[in-house]
Amino acid sequence: MALRKNTLAVQNDSELLSYIINQNPILSENIDLPVQGESIKPIGQIIINNERYRNAFINTVNLIGLTIIKRNGWDNPWDFTVRGTLSFGQQIRELILDLCNVYDYNKELKEDEAGFIKSVVPNVFNYIHEVNFQKFYKTSTSDAQLAMAFEREGNLFRFIEEAISMLYESLKYDRFIVDKYMLCRRILDGTVTPTQIANYDTLTPRQRVSALKAVSNKFTFRNPNYNPAGIRKATSFDDQILIVNTEFEADFSTDVLATSYFRDEADMRARLALIDSFSQHDNDRLQKLLLDAYIPFTEDEIEELEKIPAVLISREWFMDYYYLLDNAGETKELSFYNPQTLRNNHFLHAWMVFSTSPFEQATVYTPTAGTVTAVSVSPQSSTVSAGGQVQLTAKVTTTGFVNKAVKWSVTKGSEGGATVDQNGLVKIPSGFTPASSAVQITATSIYDNTKTGTASITVA
């Protein structure tokens, strides 16, 4: 579930204080409700001067703080990325079945009459998503701030904002920038299928929207070309999300988008998500959030990302989940009073899974065509003893957004038993005795099989 966005139907501090008192039995049993039009300062003094009442007040503020954000609140346009909650364990296993194998009746009858008793394993694909975000946010409030909350109109709202609301606002913002980072990294890695909009600069707004709509229509048919796993997947219109940058959206009137792409304005509001920019990121905060997992964007990558007008994804493409701390809620709020500093420390803990699906459909719209310019393998030459192994890596140089994956193969030395797996790990058997002691490994671009790189291995 996403963070709640509801706000309380209160108009002033008296109504807000009445709500807080009614929410806590300790307060409601011992303190009278404020009278509209009268100062709440006398009630504030009662609360401040009694430790039991003060603690009850702070605890209630912790519980309701999320629902009364009103000043610096921001609605995350990507609330759809949260899929649910994880109650137990640290992993979520995503399973999907591809189509069943098909057989020719006459051929099978002739070649394998007993085939009907054989078991056929379903074409099952799976991917594991793990809890990878364990953060907490902290702020402090003083007795002086609590006392000021009852001094004049508006101060009670301000106190709760300072104590609680910005904790949630910080988490909400961090969710957005991490999701945006994951999307852009997938695009740059080439695992989001590119769709070129030719002559983009000369097209009219309606023609540009028409180009977007053409791929949206294709999404509704089973197609293996829009996910890196090659699953024959279809996505209905209702489950498609179109992410557009603010400049792209500003070029179109509501009428153009609502009539040329979406069914109506209501459909547009449900399936259109804005992004401030594909190329601008809060790098300093991302570094603190992701630590070693953060890979800074290069200038060339930023230049390519800046060209993107829109991205189309399945609603289930993002795999974000809250981990239920103590199996109680999406987040955990805690506070304690420090008698030495006379301050309340407020904490918000959030554990999450931030991930994306390799099976759901996605495409990135781009005005330029992507190409593979070169494939290189490192190390280019090495010496390995019989029975040993060596790890090779491939670097695929590209322009635009294309799949950077490669297919590994043994192009010389396979007769001696040399093998290479899909990750580039080469193994030489202990009995390796080819006519020549040299082994050649080739990495072939998946996107453009005319581009290859090779490595030579000498078996000592």
Positions of PLM-derived features:
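Extended, compositionally biased alpha-helical segments that mediate assembly or anchoring
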Residues: A2-N62, I275-G370
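Extended oligomerization regions of viral-like shell subunits
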Residues: V35, A211-D326
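Assembly/oligomerization interface modules of large self-assembling protein complexes
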Residues: R54-T139
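Long, contiguous amphipathic alpha-helices that act as assembly "spine/axial" helices in icosahedral shell
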Residues: F125-Q196, H346-L348
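Low-complexity "stalk/linker" and mucin-like segments enriched in Ser/Thr/Pro/Ala/Gly
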Residues: T411-V426
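A short beta-strand micro-motif common to beta-rich folds, especially ectodomain repeats
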Residues: P434-N449
